[in-house]
Design a protein with these regions (language model features):
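Anion-binding (especially nucleotide phosphate/pyrophosphate-binding) glycine-rich loop
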Residues: 1-14
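Glycine-enriched loop-and-adjacent helix/strand subsegments that border the catalytic/binding cleft
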Residues: 13-141
Length: 141
């Protein structure tokens, strides 16, 4: 209905951990080496917004970009989890757009947080699909 806003399927995540250069094609596209270890970074809570919310451009931004990602939504606390058991902790999956301001990210001492943590830089959803409903390794994105 008109005037109704669809929010993110996970409203207030305790943590939003992202993996940088997680697609070989994207690493090559940016001219960077394919990492041998995951490059982890955080997005802040105010990055999360609904799938149809406006993305707010930061002041002086001129190189906005986005990447389609799959979000793994954890369903229970995970600490010292064996690799073979890791998927048992996943409650479900959602679509996420990892929004970036590339000049802030790359030209300011390579600080990913500066380019990836602005308000609304993590549109999420619209749906959360339960872990038993799909095989995340068999998705076209």
């Amino acid at each position: 209905p008109e005037g109704v806003r669809l929010g993110p399927p996970v409203a207030r995540p305790w943590s939003f951990i992202a993996v940088g250069l997680n697609y070989a094609d994207h690493a090559r596209e940016t001219g960077q080496e394919i990492p041998t270890e995951p490059i982890l970074f955080n997005k802040l809570g105010n990055c999360i917004c609904g799938p149809y919310d406006d993305v707010l451009y930061p002041k002086n931004s001129d190189r906005m970009d986005w990447e389609l990602e799959i979000a793994f939504v954890m369903g229970k606390r995970a600490r010292y989890v064996e690799e073979k058991d890791a998927m048992d902790y996943v409650a479900g999956y959602a679509i996420c757009n990892d929004v970036s301001e590339r000049r802030f990210q790359m030209k300011r001492n390579g600080q990913w947080m500066k380019g990836k943590c602005a308000e609304t830089f993590g549109p999420l959803g619209p749906w959360l699909v339960t872990a038993d409903a799909i095989d995340p390794s068999n998705l076209a994105m």
